[in-house]
Design a protein with these regions (language model features):
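Catalytic domains that recognize anionic headgroups
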Residues: 1-422
């Protein structure tokens, strides 16, 4: 259930659905990934009462819906890097700026796909994506919508309409969609500032109400893109993945917006997958965005490489029983603004490492709002999960950031820029 929604999720469709599954593919598959900024898991198909996303809600009826999906991190520069690299951000060569720059010594998904004849293109609506972030690495085409402005504190632009227009332009180009392709669109509008939209339902005037209007607005324009795409010759062989880079806080834990921490409202996100031969159902097992890169490349006929740190979802998308994948790891690798944070989800427990020896343990079954640290009352469980978290990170090739910037908790970013450097 979405954090803080206070409503009961709808019945699952795993035992049957009135919506027919998409027909089987008639040729090689394409993948279209849509990420929506700041979209927490309070959405109608997961039980949220407001009709904030009617188009995606209809899409969910014919999709594989994950009810407990998690982003890897709680802000864009780190979470999306995991999606396009298949690796935890702390294992990527990167600088220490908040708007992280990734070194070209990393290998991202489009580079792997290019080796196998798959074209990659992307379109975006924030200037972070146009300032040599490194996320563009390997894409054959990388575009930004016109008329946007860079503000390091927020996003003042309204761009979902422009995103859909640019998407139609790219997807209409036979150079992009004439063969196998991987397309990626990142819709920004739910990110603060929360603009009012007169055409949207009048949810109210509070920040949360305007945020819900922003989601409705993004959904409205994404719906137009999907309606346009539905009769295109490539659509029948295209897998659509819709998710978010992170969630958003509205006063929980004294927080607003996102980044800086790893609370559930910041990391529990929607995830739905719609594609040929994928019967609609709901999967309740926890899943991580670290699994998206191996899923994308396998759908495109490419074997996930051994350095990917997640596991493909393809078998369960095609009907296999979901396997156990816990613990789920969450992280904020330290930079100029973010303190170091790590977290682990296993069963009904969540452990957060706040750094400097400070850990807190939450029993999510009894306390989904993560309000009470049960570590002092359950020292054995605390010790077990601390050891498990440590063992998981001992198995990851983490690297310090480079660039010389002063880090949030002190020290300097003097890490390597690539393999073999110190």
């Amino acid at each position: 259930m979405p954090s803080g929604s206070g409503v009961t999720p709808p019945a699952t469709a795993s035992s049957g659905s009135a919506v027919a599954p998409p027909a089987a593919a008639s040729g090689p598959l394409n993948v279209l990934l849509v990420t929506i900024d700041s979209l927490r898991a309070d959405v109608p198909w997961l039980g949220y009462a407001r009709p904030i996303a009617p188009n995606l809600t209809r899409l969910a009826e014919s999709s594989v819906v994950y009810t407990r999906a998690y982003s890897v991190s709680s802000y864009t520069a780190k979470s999306l890097a995991a999606v396009v690299s298949g690796r935890y951000p702390s294992t990527l060569y990167r600088d220490a700026r908040f708007f992280t720059r990734y070194a070209d010594s990393n290998r991202f998904v489009p580079e792997l796909l290019h080796e196998h004849g798959v074209r990659s293109f992307a379109w975006h609506s924030h200037l972070y994506f146009g300032r040599n972030s490194g996320l563009e690495q390997g894409f054959d085409t990388w575009k930004l919508v016109p008329g946007i402005h860079f503000d390091p504190e927020t996003d003042n632009d309204v761009t979902s309409d422009k995103m859909t227009a640019l998407g139609i332009e790219l997807l209409s180009d036979p150079k992009q969609t004439g063969g196998r392709f991987f397309g990626w669109a990142h819709y920004m509008d739910p990110h603060d500032q929360y603009h009012a939209h007169p055409e949207a339902p009048a949810f109210g005037k509070r920040a949360r109400d305007r945020y819900d209007q922003e989601i409705w607005f993004a959904d409205h324009w994404l719906g137009k893109l999907l309606e346009w795409a539905a009769d295109k010759p490539w659509w029948a062989n295209t897998v659509l993945i819709v998710t978010a880079d992170h969630g958003e806080a509205f006063g929980e834990h004294g927080m607003y917006k996102h980044a800086f921490e790893l609370w559930d409202v910041l990391t529990h996100v929607p995830l739905l997958v719609h594609g040929p031969g994928m019967a609609p159902r709901r999967i309740e097992e926890r899943r991580s965005a670290i699994d998206l890169a191996p899923t994308i490349v396998e759908l495109l006929g490419v074997t996930p490489p051994p350095d990917f740190q997640g596991k493909s979802l393809v078998p369960e998308l095609r009907g296999a029983a979901p396997d156990a994948r816990e613990p789920i790891l969450l992280e904020l690798s330290e930079d100029t603004h973010n303190p170091p944070r790590r977290a682990l989800l296993e069963g009904h427990y969540k452990l957060i490492d706040f750094g400097r020896g400070h850990f807190e343990l939450f029993d999510l079954a009894a306390d989904p709002a993560e309000s009470t640290d049960v570590g002092p009352r359950q020292p054995a469980e605390l010790a077990r999960l601390k050891a498990l978290l440590a063992s998981k990170y001992e198995g990851l090739p983490t690297v310090a950031p480079f660039g010389g910037q002063k880090l949030h908790d002190g020290g300097r970013a003097n890490g390597p820029r690539g393999p073999g450097e110190k």
